[in-house]
Swiss-Prot record:
The lineage of its organism: Bacteria, Pseudomonadati, Aquificota, Aquificia, Aquificales. It catalyses: a 2,3-saturated acyl-[ACP] + NAD(+) = a (2E)-enoyl-[ACP] + NADH + H(+). The keyword Glycoprotein does not apply. Homotetramer. The active site is at Y146, Y156. This is Enoyl-[acyl-carrier-protein] reductase [NADH] FabI. Keywords: Fatty acid biosynthesis, Fatty acid metabolism, Lipid biosynthesis, Lipid metabolism, NAD, Oxidoreductase. Pfam families: adh_short_C2. Pathway: Lipid metabolism; fatty acid biosynthesis. Its EC number is 1.3.1.9. GO terms for molecular function: enoyl-[acyl-carrier-protein] reductase (NADH) activity; identical protein binding.
């Protein structure tokens, strides 16, 4: 029996088969979870429905998290189709592309508001609205963060601030929902080759750097993140809440360099 057998999981943020949310859905499906999906805009509907079909699901609903009405409709949709919910996967983050140019000092007021609303407040809004569906089910919520919440990653800009706020939100929500028997955690994933990631200036250099420096010397995959999400949302992690779990092959533990001797050889030769 799979680790999530009999669990009902809502997956937000699936954009394509390279997205982290897709990797999570893939791992959840393998472990026996039933899946429902959201899409943010009409142009994404067909793609998300095709992805859902691949996992044997026809539960797909529009949810623009900047609209309270959409979030209420999401709850109604899940009530009508499932009646209850065990897991929420919050894989939602956005800032206008111009906010990734220049430095954080160039952040616009509107860009800041949008980034915080969609990337952070949406977690609060979804949790509050869907909590009644998780009553008595020892529910689990997982969201996605990144190392840019802790340290400066050039050009990540306002999204780094948003991710820092997201991690704090996880801790506060963990306290709030514990009395209902539910848990929430964040996964701080290393750089993954998603389409969204390539909107960040110099992302390919960031990938090269983190791969060279992390102790394993290899990149992170969506499967790595997906399998971690399975654990965090399973009963095996029943005593874990309010955590930020790094899934980055150990990159966050390093100082300036990792695999120093190999890097010296690359730079200076044998």
């Amino acid at each position: 029996m799979g680790l999530l057998e009999g669990k009902r999981a809502l997956i937000t943020g699936v954009a394509n088969e390279r997205s982290i949310a897709y990797g999570i859905a893939k791992s959840f499906h393998r472990e026996g979870a039933q899946l429902a999906f959201t899409y943010a805009t009409p142009k994404l509907e067909k793609r998300v429905r095709e992805i859902a079909k691949g996992f044997g699901s026809d539960l797909v609903v529009k949810c623009d998290v900047s609209l309270d009405e959409d979030i209420k409709n999401l709850k109604k949709f899940l009530e009508e189709n499932w009646g209850s919910l065990d897991i929420i996967v919050h894989s939602i983050a956005y800032a206008p592309k111009e906010e990734f140019k220049g430095g954080v000092i160039d952040t616009s007021r509107e860009g800041f508001k949008i980034a915080m609303d969609i990337s952070v407040y949406s977690l609060i809004a979804l949790t509050r609205e869907l909590l009644p569906l998780m009553e008595g089910r020892n529910g689990a919520i997982v969201t996605l963060s990144y190392y840019g919440a802790e340290k400066v990653v050039p050009h990540y800009n306002v999204m780094g601030i948003a991710k820092a706020a997201l991690e704090s939100t996880v801790r506060y929500l963990a306290y709030d929902i514990a009395k209902h028997g539910h848990r929430i955690n964040a996964i701080s994933a290393g750089p993954v080759k998603t389409l969204a990631a390539y909107s960040i200036t110099g992302f390919h250099l960031l990938m090269e750097h983190t791969t060279k420096v992390n102790p394993f010397g290899k990149p992170i995959t969506i499967e790595d993140v997906g399998d971690t999400a399975v654990f965090l949302c399973s009963d095996w992690a029943r005593a874990i809440t309010g955590e930020v779990v790094h899934v980055d092959n150990g990159y966050h533990i390093m100082g300036v360099f990792g695999r120093e001797e190999e890097i010296k050889k690359e730079v200076y030769g044998d």
